[in-house]
Amino acid sequence: MTLIVSWSLNLLSNFVQAASEEPGKSSVGRKVTGFRLNDTAAGQRSFGELAGRSATVIVFLSTECPMSNNYLDPLAELAGKYEGQGVKLVLINPNRDEGQTQVAKHAQEFQIKFPMLIDLEQTVADLLGAKTTPEAFLIDADGVVRYRGRIDDQYISRLKRRESVTRHDLGVAIDELLAGKPITVAETEALGCPIARPVVPKHAKDSNAVTFNRDVMKILQDRCQNCHRPGQAAPFSLLNYRQAIKWALDIERVVTDRAMPPWKPIAGFGHFRDEQRLAESEIATITRWVASGMPEGDPNDLPPPREFSKDGWQLGQPDLVLTMTEEFEIYATGRDIIRQFVIPIGFDEDKWVTAVEFRAGNARVAHHAIFFTDSTGQARKLDAEDPLPGFSRIGFLPSGAIGGWAVGTQPQPLPDGTGMRLPKNSDLVVQMHYHPSGKPERDRSAIGVHFAKSPVQKQVAGLPVFGFRFQWPEGDDRIKTTGWFRVPVDVHAISVFPHMHMLGKEFKMTATLPDGTVIPLINIEDWDFNWQQAYFYKDPIPLPKGTIIDLESYADNSSRNPANPNNPPRLVTFGEQSTNEMCIGFIGCTADNNADFFDLLRLRRPRAQAGASIKREP
């Protein structure tokens, strides 16, 4: 099979029997013939030259979309599978802002060895009604579209993958076509990045109209630009008007659905610092702006550009920078990677930590990280036993934890007068979660540590509240897990860190004070393993001795859960791997009386909690 990567620099078209389709409208059953493309490697090419003897597959791709990039290797494999069977593959880039320089650089980075063209006028995209990258179209020998949609079902939603592909939709359609059979599933929804059509913005008709410069840019600066700027994790930037109108319709959809910015706790159930949840007024502003034609407005209304730290440290230069001891290679495509890396700290005295900041060595693949400490040397042994940098499973009981990071989160200093103890002669163990980007990558991330500059009056402890369940039966779509813990001394809660794995669906924690008052701690109703982080309360919450902290969660181990790592579902047991399951809520807290701190540490252990759970009633 000949692989023709047709990413058009200039597209000259002459359509004989095909009128343009409305984006998203089905083109299945329509005949497509007679267009010509400019191929920068071989000159002008006609559809007849590009078409396969038995069938032609057209796939729309983008250099910026990570989901599109992740299909480059599978598409090359598809090409090899059908070589010699009269099927040809044409890949088209329909994105107006991805010019020759960007495409050439992308081809070099991803080691694409084929001619590349760009559909600047989006003529072919309009012809087929394509709306997403990646999106595939299967055209038979007579020029009739027989299938359109996704390549396979590896993505549940944008950037959220299954553990394994369960249906190769495009491959199945090709097999059925070549066998002379009807296409069983002729159309599926393609998940990916939208193909941005040209927008003709309107001028504001009156002084009260919502404009980009006066109203929208400030929202993007405050809520989006941490990630949506060059060198960060987001697939595109939102730094100016041109970039914003390109993605405006998609921005409106994701903010209305509250898919972005990512913020999991539901409103009103706990009050947190630096909430990334958009206010209803902000959503309304974006919606009104799009509805009114996306006017730019008066240039004098544009706020000054947001300034970001040039050295990458948002809290300023750290007192200590701990860098992974060696680079780790991330494969191009496949399952996400969970990996632990040991970094020696090298202090012969305890240190008080007031803030920890993570700097991704490769923002394209780093998704989240958790920072443990180990004073036993067990992590070093696991690292030594694994031939690759780091090791693949926890396999040890951490001595403590000093924070974590996820895409889009900001470093959070501890309240004044508090600190986390970094034990002497210990190691930092960084648990990294990597997303493959579509090409081989390397990462060597760093953690910046800030030490206390004044005496620490209160030591922060992580209080784990365990959900006591050790088996998650297959087929059950609502598995309830509960746990509770009686606070042994007077404390103040400063943060909460929920933790479950792939089967998790809901997670809630409350605190019931001795007088019966119930305080909401956190409630997440759409758990996502890929978006877990610590949440810091706006104000420390007093929890008197005898307070009961309750945990309640639900998991789905049925085939209806697209995040289920097992197909078909199987019995899942408690364990450290993401394919195992667990349920823990970590409460960051300080003891009101320093003399009680070691009692808090002693009684927070799982065995102590298990014993206490037998005697819940006072």
Language model regions located:
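N-proximal helix/coil linker or "cap" segments that precede and/or mark the start of modular domains
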Residues: 12-34, 48-51, 184-186, 190-203
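Thiol/selenol-based redox catalytic cores and closely related redox-interacting motifs
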Residues: 119-196
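Aromatic- and Gly/Pro-enriched helix-to-coil junctions and flexible linker segments
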Residues: 187-347, 425-431, 436-438
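Bacterial N-terminal signal peptides
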Residues: 1-14
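Beta-strand-centric surfaces of beta-sandwich/beta-rich domains
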Residues: 265-272, 302-352, 357-492, 498-617
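Short active-site neighborhood of thiol/selenol oxidoreductases, capturing the structured segment around
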Residues: 48-69, 174
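Structural microenvironment flanking redox-active thiols in thiol-disulfide oxidoreductases
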Residues: 69-110, 117-127
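A short beta-strand-turn-helix
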Residues: 35-56, 205-214
